[in-house]
From Swiss-Prot:
Belongs to the MobA family. Its EC number is 2.7.7.77. The gene is mobA. This is Molybdenum cofactor guanylyltransferase. It comes from Ectopseudomonas mendocina (strain ymp) (Pseudomonas mendocina). It is an enzyme of class 2 (transferase). It is found in: Cytoplasm. The lineage of its organism: Bacteria, Pseudomonadati, Pseudomonadota, Gammaproteobacteria, Pseudomonadales. Its cofactor is Mg(2+). The N-terminal domain determines nucleotide recognition and specific binding, while the C-terminal domain determines the specific binding to the target protein.
Length: 201
């Protein structure tokens, strides 16, 4: 049976707050891919999962508001990385679990999301490809926000280092899993579009 927010309440955080340096400073979540903004592809997948959809963004708030129940912004406008967005999201999340995804991964599918949700518990659940963890594809118990706040105040800014202290549960994915592709350069956007067209033809 597919997971829905009626059967498994969770918050969802979509991270849209980066500088977009590889995209020439453009806001990645609003870049068009196959006729729609990148954020729209993620929204389509996660909207049925939650009544608490949070977007972390530092600009273009009016455009992002269409895709969220809540918008959060980093306290510091100095772009301190994705952990800042996770911290802001955890501070306002309504549910005991929070699903986290980056805005530039439009190939994420329901099967991957359900695999993360199926392992919900007291520890973070994080995608792993071989020996490499993908810390921005994860499910976090919001009870960990005090632990995160303590480390943040001590200067920690790496999601990877934070998770490593918490014995995360792994959701194993192949090294070349296309669902985890971050389309964060113009070349990657174009290549992924061609690949998707080829699969559909």
């Amino acid at each position: 049976m597919p997971v829905t927010h009626a059967s498994f309440p969770c918050s969802v955080l979509l991270l849209c707050g980066g500088r977009g340096q590889r995209m020439g400073g453009r806001d990645k979540g609003l870049l068009e891919w196959r006729g729609r903004p990148l954020i729209a592809w993620l929204h389509e997948q996660v909207r049925p999962l939650s009544d608490d959809l949070i977007l972390s963004c530092n600009r273009n708030h009016e455009r992002y508001a269409h895709y969220a129940d809540q918008l959060v912004t980093d306290e510091d406008q100095d772009f301190q990385g994705p952990l800042a967005g996770i911290r802001a999201g955890m501070a306002v999340a309504h549910h005991e679990q929070m699903l986290v995804l980056p805005c530039d991964a439009p190939l994420v599918d329901r099967q991957l999301l359900e695999a993360l949700l199926a392992h919900a518990g007291a520890r973070p659940v994080v995608v792993r490809q071989g020996d490499y963890w993908q810390p921005l594809f994860c499910l976090l118990p919001t009870a960990l926000k005090a632990d995160l706040e303590q480390l943040w105040q001590a200067g920690e800014r790496s999601p990877q280092r934070w998770f490593s202290r918490l014995a995360p549960v792994a959701v194993e994915c192949p090294i070349d899993d296309p669902r985890l592709a971050n389309l964060n350069t113009p070349e990657m956007l174009a290549a992924a579009s061609l690949s998707a067209d080829a699969r559909e033809s």
